Amino acid sequence: MTVRLSRIAPEIPVSNLKQSIDYYQQKLGFQVAVEMPDRHYAIVERDDIAIHLFQDDSQRSSRVGIHIFTEDIEALHAELQGRGARLSQGIMRQAWGNRDFRVNDDSGNEIKFTEPENE
């Protein structure tokens, strides 16, 4: 029997937890599922996507990139643009057929929203 994996919940370092929570809510349409200020940790969710945010005060310059898949790239792009998200790349068709656009969060982490070619 093969065990099926079903979801992923990336853990992303942020420079200011409160500011990042606000950004994910206001600019990307996520809701707070869990907030633990004393542990500098939160989980934000939208649909079936959960992103774990943790405050990293180490001053290291590592940033994270994640892919989130959608069935309607144009509608999502318009929504996030209207919310004032930091779009770092508009909608592009990649050589392999997927269409995507990129957003940077308030800590510089990159989120790539992708519509697979077969959608």
Where do the model's predicted regions map?
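N-terminal beta-strand motif that seeds the catalytic metal site of vicinal oxygen chelate
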Residues: 1-19, 64-66, 114-119
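Vicinal oxygen chelate
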Residues: 16-17, 66-110
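Amphipathic alpha-helical segments
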Residues: 18-31
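Short secondary-structure junctions
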Residues: 29-34, 87-89
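Conserved short beta-strand elements that form part of the metal-binding/catalytic scaffold
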Residues: 31-64, 110-115
